[in-house]
């Protein structure tokens, strides 16, 4: 299975940590966020890494070059940050099979393998790692509605009145069918091409998307305090493992 990592963002909210580097190169527990992402994807069996870069992309390219732990890396350039569906289309020519998608500003310690296993065994059209959050936080995320079979029936991007508190976490598996859906996406009220709309198009066309509930934790590294929390969690787990 191939893997895509989205790492084009400026990380404005992470300043001053991103004044001289892209968000993915901010260190957490002694190594860049992207290294955490790459390690997990390689451990999950990624045979190819496709990294979407943008802001200060040369720093990422110089650091990782063309391979990581023996897995080849290809870079795709997103010249303008116009949403996740827009970013995903930059890799269309590099992906020809089912693939993992990870947002390159998240730290995971969770059951990512369950998502990959579901994709491989059930031949679902997609599978997402999802988690429940406090209701007053749900409007910050892509919110999922599921049926009794654990299939996602609707995704709404940052709704003012969330119909659910189940949200996407930033780890997905897809078939290449997602690219056609991304081509059909129209700009949202925010002026972005939202991946949630592409997902909704897949659902309305009869595709099956499975929701895998998180077992563990993940943190979106949006602010300096998020970086600090992720670092503390990782260090605590390292300490516990050595006791």
Curated annotation (Swiss-Prot):
Disruption phenotype: Mutants exhibit defective or limited motility. InterPro entries: AglF-like, GlmU-like, NTP_transferase_dom, Nucleotide-diphossugar_trans. One of its GO terms (molecular function) is UTP:glucose-1-phosphate uridylyltransferase activity. It catalyses: alpha-D-glucose 1-phosphate + UTP + H(+) = UDP-alpha-D-glucose + diphosphate. Pathway: Cell surface structure biogenesis; S-layer biogenesis. GO terms for biological process: biosynthetic process; S-layer organization. It comes from the Archaea. Its EC number is 2.7.7.9. Keywords: Nucleotidyltransferase, Transferase. Belongs to the UDPGP type 2 family. Involved in the assembly of a N-linked pentasaccharide that decorates the S-layer glycoprotein and flagellins. Involved in the biosynthesis of the hexuronic acid found at position 3 of the pentasaccharide. This is UTP--glucose-1-phosphate uridylyltransferase AglF.
